[in-house]
């Protein structure tokens, strides 16, 4: 997962914050639109996955994500991204590793309908990261 560091202010009063930027698991995902033969696809639960067998050698997939959430694994010769720890969720885990490991509880996972998410977005002052991309992401910051 990419983590963006933001610095505000000037010495001696500097504020540093960090913004996690995982795969946004978009409804209108450019990576799905631009991939061929369902190399990148969305599961019924909304998790966007790259098929490792179909993606082998397909470096162009890296550039399809406007958020920069897909990277090239040189060793495996394939694009990779956050899988939302789908393999663990399928084994009964309640949350992905990043949420479990976050020492400040800054990361949360919520399974909610769109109307519920809008309410949560307002009450917690959440925002869509880079709304100009118009990808309908399911990750809010």
Question: Where do the PLM segments sit?
Answer:
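Non-ligating segments of multi-cofactor redox enzymes
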Residues: 1-141
């Amino acid at each position: 997962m990419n983590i963006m560091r933001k610095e505000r202010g000037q010495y001696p009063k500097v504020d540093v914050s960090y913004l996690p930027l995982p795969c946004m698991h978009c409804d209108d995902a450019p990576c799905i639109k631009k991939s061929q033969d369902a190399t990148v696809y969305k599961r019924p639960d909304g998790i966007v996955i790259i098929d490792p067998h179909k993606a082998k050698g397909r470096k162009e997939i890296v550039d399809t994500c406007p958020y920069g959430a897909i990277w090239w694994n040189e060793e495996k010769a394939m694009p990779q991204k956050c899988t939302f720890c789908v393999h663990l969720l399928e084994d009964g885990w309640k949350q992905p590793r990043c949420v479990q490991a976050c020492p400040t509880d800054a990361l949360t996972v919520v399974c909610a309908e769109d109307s519920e998410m809008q309410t949560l977005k307002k009450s917690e002052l959440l925002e869509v990261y880079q709304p100009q991309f118009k990808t309908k992401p399911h990750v809010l910051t």
